Amino acid sequence: WKKINTPWGKPSDEILIANVGKEEICFIPRHARGHKINPTNINFRANIDAMKQLDVTDIVSVSAVGSLKENLEPGKFIIADQFIDRTFSRIKTFFDEEIVAHVSMTKPTSPGLSNCCEAALKKLNIKNQKGGTYVVMEGPQFSTLAESRLYRSWKADVIGMTNMPEAKLAREAE
C-alpha cells in the first residue's frame, strides 16, 4: 500500500500496487477500506490524480450496480460505453480555477480497453455484455420506483453511484 499526496486533498485510501502476471496494477478502494466513504464524499479528483502520479495509463473501474433490464441478471458484467450523469453535489472537473477546458465525453470509454475486458471475461467464462448505458445517481439512497421507470424509458441498462465524475476526470487527466 502506498500513500499518495495530491493537490486536491487526500485520495480515498492508499493505493495497492501489485504485479499480476507481467503487469503492474494499482488499485484504490474508492469507498476506502471498510467501505467508509459514501459516494457523494469520494474525492474523485484526488483519486484520479494519484493514479496519474503513478503513471497509470488505463483505468478499469468496477462498480456494484443495479439492473434496469430484466435480461441483465445478477452476476453479469456490463462493459458500459455510455453514462448518464445524474449527480449534483460532486466536483466534476480539474479545470475550475484559473483555466477552463472543454473535454469531449461523446465516447467516454476506450474501445480498446473495453475489448480487453471482454476478452478477459470470456476467457474466465464470466457472463458479460459489451456496451451499455450506466445511469449514475447521487446516492447514497437508491432510486425511487418512478426514477427507475424514467431511466428504463431512457434505455439505460444499469444504475449505480460511483462512475461519475470519475470517468469525466479520467478523461480530463489523459
Which residues does each predicted region cover?
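Generic non-transmembrane alpha-helical segments
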Residues: 112, 116-127
